Curated annotation (Swiss-Prot):
This is Centrosomal protein kizuna. It is found in: Cytoplasm, Cytoskeleton, Microtubule organizing center, Centrosome; Cytoplasm, Cytoskeleton, Cilium basal body. Residues 192-208, 328-339, 678-690 have a biased composition (Polar residues). Its main location: cytoplasm. The keyword Acetylation does not apply. GO terms for cellular component: cell projection; centrosome; cytoplasm. InterPro entries: Centrosomal_kizuma (IPR026742). Residues 210-219 have a biased composition (Basic and acidic residues). Centrosomal protein required for establishing a robust mitotic centrosome architecture that can endure the forces that converge on the centrosomes during spindle formation. Required for stabilizing the expanded pericentriolar material around the centriole. Belongs to the kizuna family. Residues 192-238, 279-305, 323-348, 642-690 are annotated as: Disordered. Residues 658-668 have a biased composition (Low complexity). It comes from the Eukaryota.
Length: 736
């Protein structure tokens, strides 16, 4: 136990000694640390580090400030440049202002003043003149009470007079106060004052030293003193008005008032101030040659006669509204600009009004009062032309392209262009589900626009595809209806080969183009057998009928030699052959009602007389054809053919044919009219030959196939038996 306690004590004491030693070292280190921290070197080092950090922050702030100052400098440079520009402009404006203040414009220095200062528009008999000449007249006004300036018309072709047979020419007398209004005293013709319409033509001033014609337009000595006094007063008043208008503050207002409409009104007001109760004539001046005056009168008479014939050859087209408001050239001589051109067309409503005036053998514009003449002039410039509505269908021949085409009628070339444009638009819009040719109705305004574009071969828009299809249907219905009416007249009245009958039928070229268009639509799956317009069906039926008629015609030509009688009889009795009567009936069914509705839409209020005529002629044709089918065909003798139980055999002699034909010609007129329409079917089918060949085929059949040419029969008998191809009615009236 004692040994254990001694070891413990020994270790505890050792630990205490180590603890004292460590504590002494700690105190010594603390003392050294305190001394070091309180030394100057440590304090300087701390200050150094602090200053170094401060310097770094100052450098960063300096860089940012430098960038900001650079941006400010750039902005200041731009502002400075702008200010310099404004200052320079202000200096230039200030200099101009000082020049204007120091040198004000003086307008009354003399006749040699600058022409470029001011050009107020003046008017003389509805014509515009340059202002410089008017100012010169105004300046010379103070020297003489009534100075005049004469003018000669340089272009005699462009002169328009109020009457055709007037031997006195109007002299252009310009008073000195012509800055606002200059008028010519009107001639007195049968108590009616005429207001002359004017047109553009140059007027040159005649020098006083040239040919002694300076005073050729002076006031007539026979004029009353009262009228002269009134003109003097008006001249003095207008002279003062000119001087007031030349002031700078009134220039803007004068420029606004110098419009063509205001000029016409002012000229009318000024003309009312001058009493026109006393008639006077302008004597032929001594300086002017009478031949020149006669030449001018002849030219104006020709222009007036051409104006009277305008209503017969007028074509409706749009008149562009163009007004020349430019100032006259300062270096040019005195010129006259006239309000209208003589070649402008009139609207249809004005054409009717002009024709009424022509029945009274008066001038187109002389017969009207002055107020109505001004209204007529303004209407010609601003009115919209209404299209001429025509009920006739244009000819489908190629020669019709050279003739003038009405605006409301589609030509063949325009129709072909329309079909080609539709096909091109269909190819561009190659999509499924396009529904075209579903409606035939179209707005009248849109119809006229499309017709105008097609006639001019213009480009059509894709948006108008449905409207173009409707126009094709309408045009096809018109052609089919005209063809149907032509066939009806051929069947009833026996019209032969004339120009009028040729224009009725659908040309072969149009028909082939329509068939090609139908094939194109079928190829692109736009139309099929189930969905097909009635007019397209009629065109296809008409084409099939004409093809069958061609084959029958070829067979008939071969029967003249007696080679193929069997084939002709089979063609005649073939139930599949389309007869002309059937085609006409189908055409009427498909085109009659639809075309009547179309014309009611396009031309409301117009009575469709042609449709009624076609219905009556169709009824007559059906009755006659029914009688023809019921009648016995065995009584008809045809050269080389005999109809017996559906078989055809050749006859033994041709002399018997001529004898039977002669005996049949001695019937009564009534029976002759009935027998005239009795023909075999293969001969009736010739009536459906294409287009312009229709009348030619009928004439050939009657002259050769039916009557024949025999060597045994005499020429006189054949001449009596042969029917007249020129006029069937005269042949019938001979037996009445």
């Amino acid at each position: 136990m004692a040994e254990g306690n001694s070891d413990y004590d020994h270790r505890a004491m050792k630990l205490q000694r180590n603890l004292r030693h460590c504590e002494g070292k700690r105190l010594e280190l603390e003392r050294e640390l305190f001394q070091h921290s309180s030394s100057d070197a440590h304090i300087c080092h701390l200050k150094y580090m602090k200053l170094k950090n401060s310097l770094k922050e100052v450098c960063e702030r300096g860089k940012k400030a430098h960038l900001r100052n650079q941006a400010f400098l750039q902005e200041f440079d731009l502002i400075e440049a702008r200010l310099f520009g404004l200052i320079s402009n202000a200096n230039a404006l200030q200099k101009k202002k000082m020049q204007l203040k120091s040198h004000p414009p003086e307008m009354n220095k003399g006749p040699n003043m600058s022409r470029s200062t001011y050009h107020p528009a003046t008017i003389f008999m509805g014509r515009q003149m340059s202002a410089s000449s008017s100012i010169e007249h105004c300046l010379t006004q103070r020297k003489s009470p009534q100075p005049t300036k004469s003018f000669s018309i340089s272009d005699p072709h462009s002169v328009r007079q109020a009457a055709m047979n007037r031997n006195v020419t109007d002299s252009c007398v310009v008073p000195a106060n012509s800055d606002i209004q200059c008028l010519n005293k009107p001639d007195k013709i049968d108590g009616n004052t005429s207001f002359q319409l004017s047109q553009k033509m140059p007027v040159t001033s005649v020098a006083s030293s040239e040919d002694g014609r300076t005073h050729r337009a002076q006031i007539d000595k026979s004029q009353s003193g009262r009228k002269h006094l009134v003109e003097s007063k008006q001249s003095a008043q207008l002279s003062t008005q000119i001087l007031e208008r030349l002031s700078p503050e009134n220039r803007a207002r004068d420029l606004q008032n110098d419009s063509p409409g205001n000029m016409v009104e002012k000229s009318l007001m000024y003309e009312r101030l001058v009493p026109n109760e006393e008639s006077f004539t302008h004597a032929n001046p001594s300086g002017a040659s009478p031949d020149a005056c006669d030449y001018i009168n002849n030219q104006t008479s020709d222009k007036h006669s051409a104006r009277e014939n305008l209503s017969e050859t007028i074509e409706s087209h749009l008149i562009p509204e163009e007004e020349d408001k430019q100032c006259l050239d300062s270096s040019s001589d005195l010129t006259v600009s006239i309000s209208e051109s003589e070649d402008d067309s009139y609207p249809p409503c004005e054409v009717n009004r002009i024709e009424v005036n022509q029945n009274d053998e008066k001038n187109l514009y002389t017969a009207l009062p002055k107020q109505e003449t001004v209204i007529l002039k303004n209407y010609e410039q601003s009115s919209v032309i209404q299209p001429l509505q025509t009920s006739e269908v244009n000819s489908c021949d190629e020669s019709s392209s050279a003739s003038t085409i009405s605006q409301s009628n589609l030509s063949d070339e325009g129709f072909f262009h329309l079909l080609q444009s539709i096909e091109r638009m269909v190819l561009l819009r190659e999509q499924g589900g396009m529904e075209l040719y579903q409606r035939a109705g179209i707005n009248q305004k849109q119809l006229l626009r499309l017709i105008s574009v097609c006639n001019r071969m213009g480009a059509l828009r894709v948006e108008d595809l449905e409207a173009c299809c409707a126009l094709v249907l309408c045009k096809t219905q018109e052609l089919l209806k005209s063809t149907f009416v032509g066939y009806s007249h051929e069947a009833t009245a026996g019209i032969h080969n004339t120009d009028e009958s040729k224009e009725r039928f659908l040309s072969r070229k149009c028909q082939e183009r329509l068939l090609g268009h139908i094939a194109f639509l079928n190829k692109h799956h736009i139309l099929n057998e189930k969905v097909l317009p009635e007019c397209f069906t009629s065109v296809m039926m008409l084409s099939d009928g004409q093809n069958s008629c061609k084959s029958v015609e070829n067979v008939e030509n071969s029967t003249e030699d007696g080679n193929v009688p069997q084939v002709s009889s089979t063609m005649k009795d073939d139930p599949l052959t389309i007869k002309p009567r059937q085609i006409v009936q189908e055409l009427y069914k498909t085109t009659g009602s639809s075309h009547q509705e179309f014309e009611t839409q396009v031309h409301p209020g117009v009575v469709l007389q042609s449709a009624n005529i076609s219905v009556e002629s169709n009824t007559q044709a059906e009755e006659e054809n029914d009688e023809d089918e019921i009648s016995d065909l065995s009584e008809i003798y045809i050269p080389g053919l005999t109809v017996e139980e559906g078989n055809a055999t050749t006859k033994a002699s041709k002399k018997q044919i001529s004898e039977t034909s002669f005996s049949s010609s001695e019937k009564s007129p009534i029976s002759r009219k009935e027998d005239k329409n009795i023909q075999p079917n293969y001969m009736k089918s010739n009536n459906m030959s294409t287009g312009n060949k229709f009348s030619k085929v009928v004439t050939t059949v009657k002259s050769k196939a039916f009557w024949g040419e025999s060597e045994d029969s005499s020429s006189e008998i054949e001449a009596m038996l042969r029917p007249k191809t020129e006029s069937v009615d005269d042949f019938d009236d001979f037996f009445d």
